[in-house]
Structures are given as structure tokens and as C-alpha cells.
């Protein structure tokens, strides 16, 4: 008795060659709908599913494989006499190989399918057959990915059957595949049919392996890069690499952080970043000048940094960037000349990202792993209106200082807390990240500012991601000659801080909104 294979695929890639091979090996093929049409066209002998079930496909194909004569043939254990007896009593011939891939739900969603179209792309029979076959992998080979045709074909050709090891691996892959498929459906329907003021009791997320990495944050750590099942266009995951070796774990983390900063600026802007903190941000009327500002902000820390430009890289800008060592440059595009210049540097990584979709990326939730769980939050992308800010001091900020405050407030929310930043209206001057007390961060930012040209420091302001708990911060700021501060306010000692500012003639604005970043 010849062995039987059931083939029902949406993705026809490679199926003709595979079907021809197993037919030559003596397998009987059962097929459905569109798959049968393809096999018939290639004159590959096959049996329609309704010839096996004695029941026609119905409801536009919604019901065709959900039948005991199919699932009994898949689930019957060959090592149990009772199962084999039941198969014989009901005239069911076992099916030994299942080749199924599912309706293109993800592809239809990414193409903007309507709700009605999405519902029709929810596969029922396919996952059922895959799960039945995978459950009975002791006897049944199940294939859900065209990439596995070759290894199955190779074993069948050599031994007449597949090894238990391969069947186990393919079964595990099936359950990963169907779980991912269902997770996308759950995610879509949860967004389409939300329940007001409640959180889903289950969080179903799915990610696809994008890149295996040499190591993680440190060489002793293993790591891989997975991309969301529903890709975000403006992201490092969807970047296109033009030059250089593959990204490392730390590269991906830093590039993601730099892209988030660049997203907040509409004017020509260059972001330089090291170890998840900005070391230079510059904005100008053109990208070359913006590079100059970002570089001058900290010409030491930028060495080996991650650079994001929100305009095309020009020849002039490339010439300047090529003079120092940079890990990564990301931009919407590169001029031909710029690409030629930068590609001469073997160790640099050049990438492009689609900046036209940056607003859409703001909707993606941030997921952070902790031991035993996940934290999920919205991104810190609230649109603030500076007209609603409150001047807390007697001294009013000048127009130039207000422009600098807007710039500082955009930038400081990307500095690790306790985060302090000193800027003028177009350039960061000093960054004080990640200290466990705020005055420590203030001192670092001011020290970095002290070596800047006096002209750069004119109209400089200081931004703080959270309130000042004590007036000692203001003492340090006054010593450095800073005359304007932007911060959220909200401390029980706000009045002490205000009085200190008034004492030193410093203008201070409260935004009413904190921007911690951990």
C-alpha cells in the first residue's frame, strides 16, 4: 500500500517540484482547491479532497478538510491496535505526510485589507491539519514552510521515510508557526474590537528571527535579533544596510535610541549617540551645518558613535564625517558621491530608513523584559504646547531663551535619568546622564559645557528631565553662568528652588510634565 500525502498550500513556491518528487517515490497525493489546480496543470497525479471525504467543499471553501476521514487519518496512532482497528472499521487510510501553509493573513493586513477581507483570511482548516499532524509526529511528517521541502525530500529519497528527529523538529516548528499565526489574529481583533477601559487578560506577541548575533551585550552573552510580526517601517528592524559588517547587539540598541531622538525633529537634524545617550544634537537650515553643530557639541564622545541624519547625506557632509571613526550612519538616503566617500571606510555601517513613516512608529508599544514578566507602556511621544508652560520666577525668559528651552526639552527626554542637558537653540552643549543624584548629573553637564566657546554658551539654557529636589542644584547652575532653566516642577521644595533662581536672576519655566528615561 502506497503512502499518502495531503498537500494544501497558499504559497505555491516549490510545491510542484516537491510533489513531482514524492509522486516519483510512489506517494499518493491528496490535494485541495487551488493546489489541485496547480498540480493538474503540471499533470501530477492527485486526488481531490472531496473524493476522500465523500463530501463536497462548501461555503466558498470554508469547509473542506474538517472531516473525520481526514483528521482520523492524521491522528490515528500506528502503535495502538485500538486506533488501527478504528481506522479499519471506518475505512480510513492513514495519511503519512502533510504539507500545508496558511492563508496570507499577515500579508493581507500589511496590504491594508478591510475587516471583511481579514476575517476571510483567518485559516481554520489549515491550522487544524497542521496541529493534528504535529501531534502525531511519531508517525506523520508535517511541513509548514517551503524551506523544509528539500530536507524532507532528501530523507524520503534515501530511506523511504523521514527520521523521528526530523519529524520532531518539524512538529515543534508547526506549533511555533500556528501560535504566531493566531497571535497576529488576536492582536488584530483586539485592536479592531477593543473593550473600553480594560486591558487584555492575555498578551500575545509574535516576532520573527531577523538575525543571529555573534554575541550579546558582552561576548559571554548569546543574543538574537527578532522583528515584530507586524513590522514597523521606521525602525532599525526595517533598515536597509548599504555597506559594512552586520549589526551587533549594542549597535541595534544604540541605533534604535538614536532613531527615536531623530524622530522628534522636523528641521534638518543630526543626532550623535553613544551608549544609549545623545552626545550631540544639532539642527540647522541644512544638514551639513547640522552635522557641524552635532560634532562640535562633543568632538570627543562622538568618536565611535552612532549617527542619524534626517536628510539625505550630501557629498560635503560625507567628507566631514569620513574624517573620524563612526560605527553607524543612518539616513533616508545618500547622494552617489556621499556613498562613494563613506564606502571607502571598511568598518563603517551605512543604513537607510524610511523617514516618511516616522509618525506611525509612535503607536508601537514599548515592551521591556524583567525576570518573570514583561512591562508594556506607550511611548513618551506626547505633543506639548510651550504656550502652556509656566514661568515660575520673577525673571522672564527672553525669546531666544524660550527657543533654547524648546530645543532642550526635546533633547533631555532622551537622556538617561537623572538626565540633565545644556543647550542653546540649535545645539547641545553638555549632557549629564544617568547619575543617582540630580546634582551629580548637573555637574557633569556643566563641566562638559565649560570648555565651549563663550559665543556658543550665550543664551544657553539647562533642561532637567524631572524636578529639582533641592536648591543646591541651582547653586551649581548659577556658578556656571546659566541664566535659564526648563524643568517639570512638582517638588515639595519647588518654592525653595524658585527662590534660589530669583536670588541668582535665573529665569525658570515649569512644563508640568516629567520625562524619566531608564
From Swiss-Prot:
Pathway: Purine metabolism; IMP biosynthesis via de novo pathway; 5-formamido-1-(5-phospho-D-ribosyl)imidazole-4-carboxamide from 5-amino-1-(5-phospho-D-ribosyl)imidazole-4-carboxamide (10-formyl THF route): step 1/1; Purine metabolism; IMP biosynthesis via de novo pathway; IMP from 5-formamido-1-(5-phospho-D-ribosyl)imidazole-4-carboxamide: step 1/1. One of its GO terms (cellular component) is cytosol. One of its GO terms (biological process) is 'de novo' IMP biosynthetic process. SMART domains: AICARFT_IMPCHas, MGS. Its EC number is 2.1.2.3, 3.5.4.10. It catalyses: (6R)-10-formyltetrahydrofolate + 5-amino-1-(5-phospho-beta-D-ribosyl)imidazole-4-carboxamide = 5-formamido-1-(5-phospho-D-ribosyl)imidazole-4-carboxamide + (6S)-5,6,7,8-tetrahydrofolate; IMP + H2O = 5-formamido-1-(5-phospho-D-ribosyl)imidazole-4-carboxamide. Pfam families: AICARFT_IMPCHas, MGS. Keywords: Hydrolase, Multifunctional enzyme, Purine biosynthesis, Transferase. One of its GO terms (molecular function) is phosphoribosylaminoimidazolecarboxamide formyltransferase activity. Residues 1-144 form the MGS-like domain. The IMP cyclohydrolase activity resides in the N-terminal region. Belongs to the PurH family. HAMAP family: PurH. This is Bifunctional purine biosynthesis protein PurH. It comes from Lactococcus lactis subsp. cremoris (strain SK11). The gene is purH.
Amino acid at each position: 500500500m502506497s503512502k499518502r500525502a495531503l498537500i494544501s498550500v497558499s504559497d505555491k513556491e516549490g510545491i510542484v517540484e516537491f510533489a513531482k518528487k514524492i509522486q516519483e517515490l510512489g506517494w499518493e497525493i491528496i490535494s485541495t482547491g487551488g493546489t489541485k489546480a496547480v498540480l493538474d496543470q503540471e499533470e501530477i497525479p492527485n486526488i481531490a479532497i472531496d473524493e476522500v471525504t465523500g463530501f463536497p467543499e462548501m461555503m466558498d471553501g470554508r469547509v473542506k478538510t474538517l472531516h473525520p476521514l481526514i483528521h482520523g487519518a492524521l491522528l490515528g496512532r500506528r502503535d495502538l491496535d485500538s486506533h488501527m482497528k478504528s481506522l479499519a472499521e471506518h475505512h480510513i487510510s492513514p495519511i503519512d505526510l502533510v504539507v500545508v501553509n496558511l492563508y496570507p493573513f499577515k500579508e493581507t493586513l500589511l496590504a491594508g485589507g478591510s475587516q471583511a477581507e481579514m476575517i476571510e483570511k483567518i485559516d481554520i482548516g489549515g491550522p487544524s491539519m497542521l496541529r493534528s499532524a504535529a501531534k502525531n509526529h511519531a508517525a506523520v511528517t508535517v511541513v509548514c514552510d517551503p524551506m523544509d521541502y528539500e530536507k524532507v525530500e532528501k530523507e524520503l529519497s534515501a530511506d523511504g521515510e523521514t527520521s523521528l528527529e526530523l519529524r520532531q523538529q518539524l512538529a515543534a516548528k508547526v506549533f511555533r508557526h500556528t501560535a504566531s499565526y493566531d497571535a497576529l489574529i488576536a492582536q488584530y481583533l483586539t485592536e479592531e474590537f477593543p473593550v473600553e477601559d480594560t486591558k487584555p487578560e492575555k498578551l500575545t506577541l509574535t516576532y520573527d528571527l531577523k538575525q543571529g548575533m555573534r554575541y550579546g551585550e558582552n561576548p559571554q552573552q548569546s543574543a538574537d535579533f527578532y522583528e515584530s510580526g507586524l513590522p514597523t517601517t521606521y525602525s532599525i528592524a526595517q533598515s536597509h544596510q548599504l555597506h559594512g559588517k552586520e549589526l551587533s547587539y549594542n549597535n541595534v540598541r544604540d541605533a534604535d535610541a538614536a532613531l527615536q531622538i531623530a524622530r522628534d525633529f522636523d528641521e534638518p537634524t543630526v543626532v550623535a549617540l553613544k551608549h544609549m545617550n545623545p552626545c550631540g544634537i544639532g539642527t540647522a537650515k541644512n544638514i551639513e551645518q547640522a552635522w557641524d553643530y552635532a560634532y562640535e557639541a562633543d568632538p570627543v564622545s562622538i568618536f565611535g558613535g552612532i549617527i542619524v541624519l534626517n536628510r539625505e547625506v550630501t557629498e560635503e557632509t560625507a567628507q566631514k564625517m569620513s574624517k573620524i571613526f563612526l560605527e553607524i550612519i543612518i539616513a533616508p538616503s545618500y547622494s552617489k558621491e556621499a556613498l562613494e566617500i563613506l564606502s571607502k571606510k571598511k568598518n563603517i555601517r551605512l543604513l537607510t530608513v524610511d523617514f516618511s513613516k516616522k509618525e506611525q512608529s509612535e503607536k508601537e508599544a514599548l515592551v521591556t523584559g524583567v525576570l518573570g514578566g514583561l512591562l508594556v507602556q506607550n511611548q513618551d511621544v506626547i505633543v506639548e504646547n510651550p504656550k502652556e508652560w509656566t514661568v515660575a520666577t520673577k525673571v522672564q525668559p527672553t525669546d531666544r531663551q524660550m527657543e533654547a528651552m524648546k530645543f532642550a526639552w526635546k533633547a533631555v527626554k532622551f537622556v538617561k535619568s537623572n538626565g540633565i542637558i545644556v543647550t542653546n537653540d540649535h545645539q547641545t552643549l553638555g549632557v549629564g546622564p544617568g547619575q543617582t543624584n540630580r546634582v551629580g548629573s548637573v555637574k557633569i553637564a556643566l563641566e562638559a559645557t565649560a570648555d565651549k566657546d563663550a559665543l556658543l554658551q550665550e543664551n544657553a539654557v539647562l533642561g532637567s528631565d524631572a524636578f529639582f529636589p533641592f536648591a543646591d542644584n541651582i547653586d551649581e547652575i548659577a556658578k556656571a553662568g546659566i541664566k535659564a532653566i526648563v524643568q517639570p516642577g512638582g517638588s515639595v521644595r519647588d518654592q525653595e528652588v524658585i527662590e534660589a533662581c530669583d536670588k541668582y536672576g535665573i529665569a525658570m519655566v515649569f512644563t508640568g510634565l516629567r520625562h524619566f528615561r531608564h
